[in-house]
């Protein structure tokens, strides 16, 4: 008797929020969460997390190193709404209040294998000089009530933002049953081994 064809595919993601570059700031920590479409559902692992506080390295890079692990598995019936990871970085201001130092988002890589991504971060800005001074004095900087809005397009065009810092992520991606459902994610099979019959590109 033939085995039934799969009705869903799996996307397994692990890796780490590796490090960050914020030249103007120190003693920062990072929160992450995943945003995905309505046809997706997590089946294992953690959808969100918060790292330890990291201080800048003493070498010339002055990197903030978290090496904070990511491990989650999703199932879906179609690729629409492919998961994105949203990052929020926080740290103290001159008054000791935790304020946002950067938001950023990136899609989980589509092809299986090992991937490295550097995400440019940004912060919302007050629209006037008076608002900037008031928010600085009160210790309440502009921030999103829900960081997941970073991964969505609605309303982003009317938000004033300023670029600030970078965060580096490492992903190890494995997919299962995507080809059986008719989706081709590239020359890497479900075990993460390059297929010898296809040309091998440079690793991302």
Curated annotation (Swiss-Prot):
Its main location: cytoplasm. GO terms for molecular function: hedgehog receptor activity. Residues 9-127 form the C2 B9-type domain. One of its GO terms (cellular component) is cytoplasm. Keywords: Cell projection, Cilium biogenesis/degradation, Cytoplasm, Cytoskeleton. It is found in: Cytoplasm, Cytoskeleton, Cilium basal body. One of its GO terms (biological process) is neuroepithelial cell differentiation. The keyword Cytoplasm applies. It comes from the Eukaryota. It holds the Pfam family B9-C2. Component of the tectonic-like complex, a complex localized at the transition zone of primary cilia and acting as a barrier that prevents diffusion of transmembrane proteins between the cilia and plasma membranes. Required for ciliogenesis and sonic hedgehog/SHH signaling. PANTHER family: B9 DOMAIN-CONTAINING, B9 DOMAIN-CONTAINING PROTEIN 1. Part of the tectonic-like complex (also named B9 complex). Belongs to the B9D family. This is B9 domain-containing protein 1. It comes from Rattus norvegicus. The lineage of its organism: Eukaryota, Metazoa, Chordata, Craniata, Vertebrata. The gene is B9d1.
